[in-house]
A protein has these predicted regions:
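Active-site-adjacent loops and short helices of periplasmic peptidoglycan-processing enzymes
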Residues: 34-200
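Bacterial N-terminal signal peptides that target proteins for export
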Residues: 5-21
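Bacterial N-terminal signal peptides
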Residues: 20-29
Length: 391
């Protein structure tokens, strides 16, 4: 290897090392700013940026605790994914079993042999926190409660929720011969992140304050009071029973940024809500709206053209892209061009030739199409020969 090549390789390694150090330092600064705040009154809390996976604050977030009704988030996630993947239909009819009709706790009072669609039961599950709806959906998807619980634990493993064990589809307190569901605040945040990514349709349900059931004979009311007391909150799920304390997995959006906050084993619902509001507010204060690219901006001025009357062409960003980012990381966004290298003629102006991706710490945070700045006419035989032997 020649000296110049060695120097280039060494320079590349040093640049990557410096970038890693900068990212680590900036992340540390964020952690320190949160650490200076007082500890929360809840046993376990976490604040997550779901776009990047960054943990902005955590307190005892890796201790498995009873989630109570927050266990229903996994039930809803599995059912909605089955709908999205075509394994079941949202309009499929679910017949209520005898076991479902006898369940206690929060419910919509399903009666044996009654029939409801999956959509209706998902609404009951996420708005009223209906235990009977949770079990009815579990039986319909897997044939039995036990089969569905196995599925819940399989999904947990896929999502790398290593501090989670489910024993029920609803999170009710265990009977004497049963074990409690256990999940950490960190794992609930991972589940919320998966819901936002894979089944965002659930936000249409979790964001509803109330909704009718049985054609209006029963009005379901959401237990998540953050929906009306914290601007931008549109989910996800509360939970409570005596041994579990008060808990919530919340998400909110502000100026294009979204955060997830989890609080578990809080002494009262008021303290729970106050702690989560404080976490979300401090988190959003770190964000700013950043323009990554203008619509029509030149991304490359000389992308090579094969088989054309010209040898190169400019490519443009199709859309303006703005994202909300935590201020320390805004300058670390990288641009990556996929495609347009080369461009095959003939091609029309504004036709797509690739994608411009914006990447932060290895994760894509936004993208837009790349389009041609001009018409590309087909060239003569010489241009075609150049295309065959390399541009």
């Amino acid at each position: 290897m020649c000296l110049n090549t060695k120097l280039v390789v060494l320079s590349s390694i040093m640049n990557k090392t410096v970038l890693t150090i900068i990212i680590s330092f900036l992340t540390l600064l964020v952690s320190i700013s949160f650490a200076e705040e007082k500890r929360t009154s809840c046993q376990s809390t976490i604040l997550l940026d779901p776009a990047t996976g960054e943990v902005l604050f955590e307190q005892d977030a890796h201790t498995p605790l009873p989630p109570a009704s927050m266990a229903k988030l996994m039930t809803a996630y599995i059912v909605r994914r089955r709908v999205n993947e075509g394994q079941v239909s949202a309009g499929d009819i679910v017949r209520v079993s005898a076991e479902v009709s006898k369940i206690g706790g929060s419910q919509v009072y399903l009666k044996e042999h009654e029939e409801f669609s999956i959509t209706e039961l998902l609404e009951a599950l996420m708005i009223e926190s209906a235990n009977d709806a949770a079990l009815a959906l579990a039986e319909h998807v897997s044939g039995s409660r036990e089969g569905f619980v196995d599925l819940m634990n399989q999904e947990s493993q896929k999502l790398k929720m290593t501090e989670t064990t489910f024993f029920s589809p609803h999170g009710l307190p265990p009977a004497k011969d049963q074990k409690p569901d256990l999940i950490s605040a960190h794992d609930l945040a991972l589940l919320a992140q998966a819901i936002l990514k894979d089944t965002p349709e659930l936000l249409e349900l979790t964001g509803k304050v109330e909704a009718p059931f049985r054609a209006g004979a029963f009005v379901m009311r959401n237990h998540n009071h953050l929906l009306t007391s914290f601007p931008g909150c549109d989910g996800l799920k509360t939970g409570y029973y005596a041994q579990a304390g008060f808990g919530v997995t919340a998400t909110a959006q502000k100026n294009g940024a979204r955060l997830v906050a989890v609080a578990m084993n809080c002494p009262t619902s008021k303290i729970r809500d106050a702690e989560v509001k404080a976490l979300l507010s401090r988190g959003f204060n770190q964000f700013k709206l950043v323009k990554l690219v203008d619509r029509g901006a030149v991304v490359q001025s000389d992308s090579p053209v094969v088989g054309g009357a010209v040898s190169s062409s400019a490519i443009l960003a199709k859309d303006e892209i703005k994202v909300s980012l935590r201020e320390p990381l805004a300058s670390l966004v990288e641009k990556k061009v996929d495609g347009c290298n080369p461009i095959n003629a003939p091609a029309k102006k504004d036709s797509s030739c690739g994608v411009l991706r914006f990447v932060l710490k290895g994760k894509e945070i936004a993208k837009t199409e790349l389009v041609l700045a001009q018409d590309l006419e087909k060239g003569g035989m010489l241009s075609s020969l150049k295309g065959l032997i390399g541009y």
